[in-house]
Amino acid sequence: MKTPASSRLLVAGYYGFGNLGDEMILASLLAIARRLWPGCSVHALSGDPEQTAALHGVTATSWTDLPGTVRAVAAADLVLLGGGGLFHDYWGVSPGDLLSPRQSGISYYAGVVALARLLDKRVGLWSLGVGPLLTPEGRELTAAVFREAEYAAVRDAASL
């Protein structure tokens, strides 16, 4: 995915929630982004923006701050979701909850992608885990997200 060196990246994943695996995923995503696009600036959506900023050297907005999320997406050149198991519907899926803190799964992350596309932003999906998808709504919403992405990579064969 070609992008200018001055790019502004927005990353969204399960960051800032105290899960070491997700923090390592963000650290590796940042290392790759900074190597590919030296000089890029990175902003993250996070459960704990202060912690995410301190740990990773990025700016961050709370994932529950809808106006802040809109500003972050609007300011980005590229919106990256991932990695990790963001697309599952263990607790159901509600398309009416797009971008809502009531849903931290498919509905929330699909909302980030929908907002990005409404604002004509590029979308990439990086090292995502997909599934289980137990509901037709979960499968349809996940497929819609993947159709909107310019680039998509999953973390394992089970996610294909």
Predicted feature residues:
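Alpha-helix/helix-capping structural signal
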Residues: 15, 157-158
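Aromatic- and Gly/Pro-rich donor/ligand-binding loops
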Residues: 1-134
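A short beta-strand/loop micro-motif in the catalytic core of glycosyltransferases
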Residues: 149-156
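Distinct, well-ordered alpha-helical segments
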Residues: 134-140
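A conserved, positively charged/aromatic
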Residues: 140-149
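Alpha-helix capping/helix-boundary segments
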Residues: 86, 158-159
